[in-house]
Amino acid sequence: INITPAIVEFLLTNENAVSILERYPFLEFTVNENYPGLNNGKDDPCLARMAIHFPLVLANFGAGASSLKPVYDGLFKRVILDKNFIHQRVSALSFEPFMRAILWQIAPHCQSVMVSGIDDHGILQRVLPFNFGAMQGTLWPAVPAERVTTLVQQ
């Protein structure tokens, strides 16, 4: 669930909302790299409190708007690498060592690293060796709800 500062403020000031949401431990709240105060990491009181109560996900990592501080501070359960970040680098000879360096820096500070932008088989082949926790992209188009069961059984 993508969250904004207004949603964070609501969640942190409404005990009823917190108690309801804590019943659903599978819910994760996503912030983008441009979230206000993100670069302050755990020194941002709202983000620090949110990370205590709920699993947080950092999306669009690599878009260029944030430092590694919030990741190093352990605020995020998951980090999702930015689609454009991947697309800009995937065809370069330096992609493999670059990705290994990024993962070496990020992976110890979260439970999983996800990659977005997997839009064709060529990109898929380039990222498979890195054992990402999950992949996202147009290689797997959206399906109607009634086809999900069939898709999973394939």
Regions found by a protein language model. Give the residues of each.
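Metal-dependent enolase-superfamily TIM-barrel catalytic cores that perform enediolate-based chemistry
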Residues: 12-16, 27-28, 33-35, 46, ...
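Short, flexible, glycine/charge-rich loop motifs used to bind or transfer phosphoryl groups or to couple energy/partner
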Residues: 17-20, 46-47, 68-70
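Charged helix-capping and loop-helix junction motifs
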Residues: 13-17, 42-45, 93-100
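Short, conserved loop/helix-junction motifs that constitute active-site signature segments
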Residues: 20-23, 50, 74
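EAL-family c-di-GMP phosphodiesterase catalytic domain
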Residues: 5-7, 26, 30-37, 55, ...
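Bacterial c-di-GMP phosphodiesterase EAL domain
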Residues: 1-24
